[in-house]
């Protein structure tokens, strides 16, 4: 974390004419008024927490405002999504449950993308604040363990959360390596129907996917809104 954090600070300094950190909503409004893009520091995978609450406090002080509970492996918070039903059913570990209340108090977002189904439902049960799935799609449309079921979408919407649609083809279309706007729209419409229009977001994962994309970067995203 420390190495990546230093890289982050250097990027902010090198691009300070167009980029500024945001710790809260007021910062976002201030940056927008100044004509700058807001950068919100996030952490994907709770491994760096190492089961220590003081690490969570440290991350918050450094500006982290969102943590994805897991990536592809078990950690001190809980378990990842898995093709193994026994793993998928596992809920959060005691430290994972403890972090929910503290993150709620601090105003840190919990991200459930990559989390086991059991862990997801623990978040629903115990979180008093909205949470998000930063880069996930709909399991009803593409049966992948990384995607959310209709019940999950409904629960997330009820909590006031957001689903960032992932542009990776394996989460949009089974058996295809192509990502097209029509597939993205299909998942957008399903999320709208099951979670509500306020739950719609984009979680492209451009830096982590190898799909054949109809557009290659953020410059092409207005085409989705025009479709």
Model-predicted regions and their roles:
Residues 1-86, 90, 143-202, 206-227:
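N-terminal hydrophobic targeting/anchoring segments and the immediately downstream early-domain regions
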Residues 94, 111, 179:
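Short, surface-exposed alpha-helical recognition segments that flank or form part
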Residues 64-66, 105-108, 126-132, 158-162:
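Glycine-enriched alpha-helix->loop->beta-strand junction motifs that scaffold or abut catalytic
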Residues 113, 134-136, 166, 203:
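Generic beta-strand/beta-sheet core signal
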Residues 89-98:
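Active-site glycine-rich loop that binds ribose-phosphate moieties when present
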Residues 98-112, 116-123, 150-158:
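Substrate-binding cleft of carbohydrate-active enzyme catalytic domains
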Residues 59, 123-126:
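Short loop/helix-cap segments at secondary-structure boundaries that form the rim of catalytic
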Residues 117, 125-131, 135-138, 144-157:
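Acidic, glycine-rich loop-and-beta core segments that form the ion-binding/anion-interacting portion
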């Amino acid at each position: 974390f420390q190495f990546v954090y230093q890289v982050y600070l250097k990027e902010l300094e090198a691009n300070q004419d167009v980029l500024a950190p945001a710790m809260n909503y007021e910062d976002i409004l201030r940056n927008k008024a100044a004509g700058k893009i807001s950068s919100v520091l996030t952490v994907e995978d709770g491994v760096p927490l190492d089961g220590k609450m003081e690490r969570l406090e440290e991350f918050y002080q450094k500006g982290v405002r969102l943590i994805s509970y897991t990536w592809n492996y078990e950690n001190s918070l809980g378990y990842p999504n898995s093709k193994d039903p026994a793993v998928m059913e596992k809920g959060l570990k005691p430290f994972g449950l403890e972090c929910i209340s503290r993150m709620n108090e601090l105003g840190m977002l919990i991200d459930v993308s990559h989390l086991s189904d059991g862990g997801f439902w623990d978040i629903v049960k115990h979180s008093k604040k909205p949470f998000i799935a930063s880069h996930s799609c709909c399991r009803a449309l593409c049966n992948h363990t990384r995607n959310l079921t209709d019940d999950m979408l409904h629960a997330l919407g009820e909590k006031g959360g957001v689903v960032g649609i992932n542009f990776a083809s394996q989460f949009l279309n089974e058996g295809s390596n192509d990502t097209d706007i029509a597939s993205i729209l299909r998942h957008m419409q399903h999320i709208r129907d099951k979670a509500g229009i306020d739950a719609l977001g984009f979680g492209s994962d451009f830096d982590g996917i190898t799909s054949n994309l109809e557009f290659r970067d953020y410059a092409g995203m207005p085409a989705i809104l025009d479709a």
